[in-house]
Amino acid sequence: RILEACTLYVLFRDMVSLQRQNFVQNLDCFLLAHLAEDLSIERLTKEFHISKNKLYESCNKYMQNGIAEHIRGLRLAEAKRLLKETTLSVHEISDRVGFNDYNYFCRIFKKYFGTSAGKYRKEQSNYHSNFLAK
């Protein structure tokens, strides 16, 4: 009986781990594909066929922060990538990653990364120039 209980525990634990992995992967895949769009709670609940409570509960359970913070983090990470890898203007990048308010994007970027988006791009450009020159 103890062996049976241990086996069931391991199976259950693995199932929960798989559920978490699937939820986070599916959510992130959808969010990354639609960063520039409105990612309201209503839209996400319709897309994933779950209630608001279940969405909040799942995000709190499987992620380190809430859904709004998670989306913001994905948007900012994509903005950093675009600043590094493209010549799009900061304004274009803010639109492309779903920040409808350019000034808000600039404030939140600086708050998260300690530097402005323009300075970040310049620093990355200087780093790559120095790296290639060596």
Predicted regions and their residues:
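Short, structured helix-loop boundary elements
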Residues: 17-24, 41
